[in-house]
Structures are given as structure tokens and as C-alpha cells.
């Protein structure tokens, strides 16, 4: 498959390329394809139309989370307007759009969220990603992946004991994404429900721990874990 990666300089896209044997990737730098500028994306689609059939949109402002609270305009320009621009060009040029979303679109209190459960983001980051999802859903040829992932090795010296997620490492998330390219709708992508500390400790027994009350400068979820039944059914009950 011929795939345009938006956000291609990020760690997740690096893993897609690493595990993407048999696929051909276009990874334009931001100066060539800036999602905030419609004309920039339009120019790229016009000149490289025949070189890709799929678009994986992983370009977004993510961390630090406080940025989205202090400067929501930045989130809107990139995560919302930028995504809308991508959607419009995918529609015009008939490209399959795979949108990389997040577990932060859920309310983050009850856990075990299904794709069909109500969404109620608790941060501006989550709101910006949900707004992106809404734009994507206005185009039929789409796939939305709500992924809970982190880099390996874990980038911090301590991990949260009182936050539950369905974390998986970016390597695994990339492998799974490449298996799902021809699916449609919304799919939760993640591992088992557990605290961040429990997840990290399996790879790093010496990891320290902390609590939300000690580290958070913005509101954070206590349980964003996801129900991944649909994912397991698609992959024949095998996560990796």
C-alpha cells in the first residue's frame, strides 16, 4: 500500500515505517505539508496524488498537556482546523483516511470504555481530538483509532499508581495499525486495563511510582481504560 504519513517525524510514525515492510511511505516534513494551512496540503495532494492511496493522520499537538489549557488556540489550529483541512483534501482526492485519536476522548472516570460509549473529554487536548474525530466522521472513507500508547523505554523515572489505562508501547500500536488499514469506523487500540505503574513495571522492575496529586498541573483521568473486544475480534483474538 502507498501511504502518506502526516506527522511523519513523530515516534509513532517512525515505528510505522519500521514495521511497514511491503508498504511505501511518503513522509513530508512540516515545511512541505503544514496541516494548519489548507493551501499547503492542497499543493501536496495536487503534486503527489498518484503516489498514495491511504493517509494516516498522526500529526497533532499532544504534550505537555498544560499547553492545551494555556493556549487552546494552538490546539484548535492544529488538532481541529488542521484535521478538517486533511479531511477535505482526502474527500476531494478520494483517499482512505486513518485518524489517530486517543483514549482522552472518554470521560476518564469509569473505565472499560467501548467505542459506542458516550464521549466526554475532560481536557482541552481530549476536546481537540474529539473535534478532529467529528470532522473525520463527515467523510465516509475513514477509520478512527483511539490508541493508548507510550514510548519504550518509558520516558519518566516514575509511573502513576492511581491512573488506569490500556497502555501499549508504540511498537505494538504501529504493528496493529498496519493490520487495520482496511477497517472502518472506530476501534479502541490498547492493552489490558491496569495502572500505569503496573504496565511499566513489567519492562522496568526498578521504576518508581507517584500519584496524580503529586504531579498533575492539569485535570487528569483516573481510569481511561478501554474495552478492546472489537480489536480482538478483528485480529482473531490476538493483540500482536
Regions found by a protein language model. Give the residues of each.
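N-terminal Rossmann NAD(P)H-binding glycine-rich loop of SDR-like oxidoreductase domains
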Residues: 1-22
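Substrate-positioning beta->alpha
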Residues: 152-182
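Conserved Rossmann-fold NAD(P)-dependent oxidoreductase catalytic core, especially the SDR/UDP-sugar
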Residues: 85-120
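Mid/C-terminal beta-alpha module of Rossmann-like enzyme folds, strongest
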Residues: 176, 180-223
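NAD(P)H-binding glycine-rich loop region in Rossmannoid oxidoreductase-like domains
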Residues: 38-78, 89
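Active-site Tyr-X1-5-Lys
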Residues: 120-148
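Glycine-rich NAD(P)-binding loop of the Rossmann-fold in SDR/ketoreductase-type enzymes
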Residues: 36, 70, 74-85, 119, ...
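Adenosine-cofactor binding site in Rossmann-like domains, unifying the SAM/SAH pocket
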Residues: 21-44
